[in-house]
């Protein structure tokens, strides 16, 4: 869900709104200010990394990338949840092996609480967990899963002896180790959240397979997921748009905090509640459940307003046009005529992923 989603969700086109235009303008102004402020901070952070690592070496956390810097930003751990790799690198001029060893051990044994780690600082706040987040997703050179510090340390020593690489980036020498996750790492992560998904599914009447497909597409089941639009967590919920809408529908004031949305259970609950709102409120005028599902999926990414405007500028007429079409034609229209290329691809990705979860 992108940051412009907030504007689409409060548009009169979608829902009747009792607040005045002045209040709406104030809401939009505050949202833009917060979002622009976040963009500025991220730009400054990226600039600092570039100054230390070099021009083509900027690496930041994202929806499907965990990136944590330590050692005055000279060492970093990167988990690419799409490719299934862990890469630990350092440009430290002193004891690079020791710094890599420590980073490997801590990355392998970190927990799954995003609120405990600041991805936008070099503070070494990674706590070794008795239940590591990556347990079962990576195995050592003997084929064993890694839960204990002694095993992680032994594996780190093995990696330093057999897989250490170095390269010169023109500014620094970069030492690195790459570890592959197990082939079914995606399923391993998904399994961690099945209980939460089932609970949210029952609570809001949203199909489990759709929730899982959204999570896979948004974050690849990365609880640390962040984005340039300040979307957070497993379902990439934006505080000022979907988060605020859900809170309002639940009789809560304000919007969910960052710590609230980085809690996996809260994130799944909020994301699922928003899917239910799209289905039962914003896009309720679409009669065919399959057509409505296609619209809901696309709206989760780009807003309900943009979905309806593909068919007509009038929301009632848009629903009537959709209702006159076969579901396959609705899918074809949304994947070819939606103004956002990202939203067009999003429907294809989520629909494909949902089919795989329905078969499981």
UniProtKB/Swiss-Prot annotation:
Predominant localisation class: membrane
Catalytic activity of the protein: Exolytic cleavage of the (1->4)-beta-glycosidic linkage between N-acetylmuramic acid (MurNAc) and N-acetylglucosamine (GlcNAc) residues in peptidoglycan, from either the reducing or the non-reducing ends of the peptidoglycan chains, with concomitant formation of a 1,6-anhydrobond in the MurNAc residue
GO cellular component: cell outer membrane
InterPro entries per UniProt: Lysozyme-like_dom_sf, Murein_transglycosylaseC, Murein_transglycosylaseC_N, Transglyc_AS, Transglycosylase_SLT_dom_1
Record-level GO BP terms: cell wall macromolecule catabolic process; cell wall organization; peptidoglycan metabolic process
Lipidation residue positions, type S-diacylglycerol cysteine: 17
Cleaved signal peptide residues: 1-16
Lipid-binding residues (covalent, N-palmitoyl cysteine): 17
CDD domains per record: LT_MltC_MltE
Keyword set, alphabetical order: Cell outer membrane, Cell wall biogenesis/degradation, Lipoprotein, Lyase, Membrane, Palmitate, Signal
Disulfide links within the chain: none
MF-aspect GO terms: hydrolase activity, acting on glycosyl bonds; peptidoglycan lytic transglycosylase activity
Pfam families reported in the protein's UniProt record: Mltc_N, SLT
Gene3D superfamilies in alphabetical order: 1.10.530.10
Subcellular location: Cell outer membrane
Bilayer topology: Lipid-anchor
The enzyme's E.C. designation: 4.2.2.n1
Family: Belongs to the transglycosylase Slt family.
Task of the protein: Murein-degrading enzyme. May play a role in recycling of muropeptides during cell elongation and/or cell division.
Name of the protein this chain belongs to: Membrane-bound lytic murein transglycosylase C
Organism: Klebsiella pneumoniae subsp. pneumoniae (strain ATCC 700721 / MGH 78578)
């Amino acid at each position: 869900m992108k940051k412009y989603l907030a504007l689409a969700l409060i548009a009169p086109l979608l829902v009747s709104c009792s607040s005045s235009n002045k209040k709406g303008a104030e809401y939009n102004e505050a949202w833009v200010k917060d979002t622009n402020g976040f963009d500025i901070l991220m730009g400054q952070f990226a600039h600092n990394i570039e100054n230390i690592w070099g021009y083509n070496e900027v690496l930041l956390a994202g929806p499907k990338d965990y990136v944590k810097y330590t050692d005055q930003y000279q060492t970093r751990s990167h988990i690419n949840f799409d490719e299934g790799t862990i890469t630990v690198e350092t440009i430290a001029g002193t004891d690079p092996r020791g710094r890599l060893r420590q980073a490997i051990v801590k990355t392998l044994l970190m927990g799954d609480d995003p609120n405990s780690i600041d991805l936008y600082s070099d503070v070494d706040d990674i706590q070794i967990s008795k239940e590591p987040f990556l347990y079962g997703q990576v195995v050592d050179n003997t084929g064993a899963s890694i839960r204990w510090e002694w095993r992680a340390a032994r594996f780190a020593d093995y990696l330093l002896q057999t897989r250490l690489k170095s390269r010169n980036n023109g500014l620094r020498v970069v030492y690195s180790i790459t570890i592959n996750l197990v082939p079914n790492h995606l399923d391993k992560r998904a399994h961690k959240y099945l209980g939460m998904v089932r609970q949210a599914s029952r609570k809001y009447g949203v199909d489990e397979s759709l929730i899982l497909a959204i999570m896979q597409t948004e974050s690849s089941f990365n609880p640390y997921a962040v984005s340039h639009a300040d979307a957070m967590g497993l379902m990439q919920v934006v505080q000022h748009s979907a988060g605020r809408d859900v809170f309002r529908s639940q009789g809560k004031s304000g919007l969910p905090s960052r710590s609230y949305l980085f809690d996996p259970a809260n994130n799944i609950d909020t994301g699922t509640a928003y899917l239910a709102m799209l289905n039962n409120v914003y896009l309720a005028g679409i009669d065919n459940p399959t057509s409505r599902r296609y619209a809901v999926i696309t709206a989760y990414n780009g807003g309900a307003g943009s979905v309806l405007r593909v068919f007509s500028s009038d929301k009632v007429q848009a629903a009537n046009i959709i209702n006159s079409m076969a579901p396959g034609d609705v899918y074809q229209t949304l994947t070819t005529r939606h103004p956002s290329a990202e939203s067009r691809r999003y429907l294809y990705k989520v629909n494909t992923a949902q089919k795989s979860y329905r078969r499981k």
